[in-house]
Amino acid sequence: MTHAIVTGANGFVGSAVVKELLNNGVSVCAVVHNDHRDNLPDHANLQIVSCELSNMKTLPGLLDESDYDVFYHFAWAGSAGPARADTALQLQNAQWTVDALHAAKEIGCQRFLCAGSIMEHETMA
C-alpha cells in the first residue's frame, strides 16, 4: 500500500490511523468535516480534503491524484449526545457509508475498510 484515503481523519480512530500510515511511508488523503484538522500532523505526504458525509459522492472530483490503494471509512455523524438516538440520522449514516463505498470504487481503491461501533446495535435495538 502506498496511498490511502481516510474519512473521519480528524476523529479519535481516524487520526491515529492517519499518523500510523504516515509513519509507515504511506501517502494519505485525510477527508475531514468543515476543514477540521486539529488532530492531524503537518506532513509532506498528507493531503487534507474537506468533504461532508452528505457529499461523499463528490469526493473523487476533489482529489489531487487517483492512485489510491485503500479507503478507510471512519466518518459517522451523531456518535455522541442526543443524536445517538436519532434513528433517521443513524440510518442516513448507513447510506453515506454506501456512498463512500461507491466513491472508493470510482477512485479505484482495491480495498475498503469500514469500522463500526455500538451505534449500529443501539439504533436497531
Question: Where does each model-flagged region fall?
Answer:
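Structural motif
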Residues: 3, 69-70, 111
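N-terminal Rossmann NAD(P)H-binding glycine-rich loop of SDR-like oxidoreductase domains
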Residues: 4-24
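Short beta-strand/turn micro-motifs composed of small residues
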Residues: 8, 32, 116
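Conserved glycine-rich Rossmann-like NAD(P)H-binding loop of the short-chain dehydrogenase/reductase
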Residues: 26-36
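Short loop/helix-cap segments at secondary-structure boundaries that form the rim of catalytic
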Residues: 37-44
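Rossmann-fold cofactor-recognition segment
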Residues: 44-55
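NAD(P)H-binding glycine-rich loop region in Rossmannoid oxidoreductase-like domains
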Residues: 53-92, 103, 123
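Conserved Rossmann-fold NAD(P)-dependent oxidoreductase catalytic core, especially the SDR/UDP-sugar
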Residues: 73, 98-125
